[in-house]
Amino acid sequence: MFVTIAIPVYNGESYLRDAIQSVVNQTFQDWELYLVNDGSTDGSLAIMQEYALRDIRIKVIDDGQNKGLVTRLNQSIEIAVGKYYARMDADDIMYITRIEEQVKFLESH
């Protein structure tokens, strides 16, 4: 994988599908996505697992505990295999060419 993308999630059920789908729809497709559950108590984990079953590039990290954003980001960095690392929040939507544009910029500098 060229780019590792991480989305830490805490109770993001109402908007998580849009966030994940915005990654899936990227024009740049050589990525892996870590959905890092931070002890969600809503339906977030089920949504994450649903997407992971549909796309082998999507992986769910879940230990059932709430440890906070920084811990979850560090956890995803430790397991990332991509040359580059990107993150976004579970309530965000990634512009369709975001990763493509960022990779082009990074590779040219």
Spans of features found by a protein language model:
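Nucleotide-sugar donor-binding/catalytic module of glycosyltransferases
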Residues: 1-109
